[in-house]
């Protein structure tokens, strides 16, 4: 195999190895070449990554090589890490979010009546993820806080407007809002 193909395979092996990394001896065994040849190819690849506008570099930690992101782009990677995802929310938070999405503006007490359990922790989580916010105060004793969804909610779930939420049909009116919401998300992701 030529050097170009060898470097392509090494690149793939580094990717497959992930954060664990891979020993040059392992690469040499896979490629059926000497370790020195692997080290030379990796060195060339490191220089190529340094000299170009690439987001990745090849680093060596504790005798293994792996891909790592470049420090100069760290602020962008942090934005991705800080972006909330549905996968990072608990079942209780997702159920509460579904209720808010379909019934907004809604008070905490109304949410608890629908769910049948307290929603304090779920509300805190959703507010901290910027998926819901206070939208005002309800009339009545104590003037309870009203909650509604945010732009981040729309972005996170790939919606342009709340009108993109599937409508509640007559047969679905008896369904739990959370079940309907999860079904709706599955439809949106197809």
From Swiss-Prot:
Domain of life: Bacteria
Protein name per UniProt: Segregation and condensation protein B
Predominant place of localization: cytoplasm
Protein role: Participates in chromosomal partition during cell division. May act via the formation of a condensin-like complex containing Smc and ScpA that pull DNA away from mid-cell into both cell halves.
Compartmental location: Cytoplasm
Cellular component per GO, a single term: cytoplasm
Alphabetical list of Pfam families matching this protein: SMC_ScpB
Keyword annotations from UniProtKB, A to Z: Cell cycle, Cell division, Chromosome partition, Cytoplasm
GO biological process, one term: cell division
Family as reported in the entry's similarity comment: Belongs to the ScpB family.
Top-level taxonomy: Bacteria, Bacillati, Bacillota, Bacilli, Bacillales
Subunit text: Homodimer. Homodimerization may be required to stabilize the binding of ScpA to the Smc head domains. Component of a cohesin-like complex composed of ScpA, ScpB and the Smc homodimer, in which ScpA and ScpB bind to the head domain of Smc. The presence of the three proteins is required for the association of the complex with DNA.
